Amino acid sequence: MAAKKAGKAGATKDRNNQVVASNRRARHNYAILDTYEAGIALMGTEVKSLRDGQASLADAFATVDDGEIWLRNLHIPEYQHGSWTNHAPRRNRKLLLHRREIDNLIGKIRDGNLTLVPLSLYFTGGKVKVELALARGKQAHDKRQDLARRDAEREVVRELGRRAKGMS
């Protein structure tokens, strides 16, 4: 048997951890306390649309109904080549977690002033996963402090780079 030829690096698409959508505003608007990886119940046309890289987590959030966690306002556009069996773009989608994880999340949400926010949507081993965060909303002054801290860190890194190059 002939051995397979090695291809160019990066020539094949890495389907193991392909990020479809990320919610960058969530890290700005919320203080992330804990993250969970959850499966998501999807229809076939939704998966095909996600493989095309089409999704928006901008207004998405998760809620608890009857001991189940649902993802609401996730926008997955209709599959372009779909027929009359296409899905509704903003339908509610069930998140798949272990019962003990669900009970743990429900307890934490009820105890504190916390919410569930999706951070990213990605493929792992051919399955769609959602990175879900247990988060607390930030006030305006908290957001300003984070921006100031990030600017200060950026300045320190810039100055260290200058000193390393001998430009002092």
UniProtKB/Swiss-Prot annotation:
Superkingdom of the organism of origin: Bacteria
SUPFAM superfamilies recorded: Small protein B (SmpB)
Keyword Oxidoreductase (UniProt): no
InterPro entries (alphabetical): SmpB (IPR023620), SsrA-bd_prot (IPR000037), SsrA-bd_prot_CS (IPR020081)
A cellular component annotation (GO) from this entry: cytosol
Gene Ontology BP term (one): trans-translation
Subcellular location, record wording: Cytoplasm
Pfam families listed in its UniProt record: SmpB
Disulfide-linked positions: none
Keywords, alphabetical: Cytoplasm, RNA-binding
GO MF annotation list: RNA binding
Free-text function comment from the UniProt entry: Required for rescue of stalled ribosomes mediated by trans-translation. Binds to transfer-messenger RNA (tmRNA), required for stable association of tmRNA with ribosomes. tmRNA and SmpB together mimic tRNA shape, replacing the anticodon stem-loop with SmpB. tmRNA is encoded by the ssrA gene; the 2 termini fold to resemble tRNA(Ala) and it encodes a 'tag peptide', a short internal open reading frame. During trans-translation Ala-aminoacylated tmRNA acts like a tRNA, entering the A-site of stalled ribosomes, displacing the stalled mRNA.
Family membership: Belongs to the SmpB family.
HAMAP family: SmpB
Name of the featured protein: SsrA-binding protein
Protein species of origin: Mycobacterium sp. (strain KMS)
Gene name for this UniProt entry: smpB
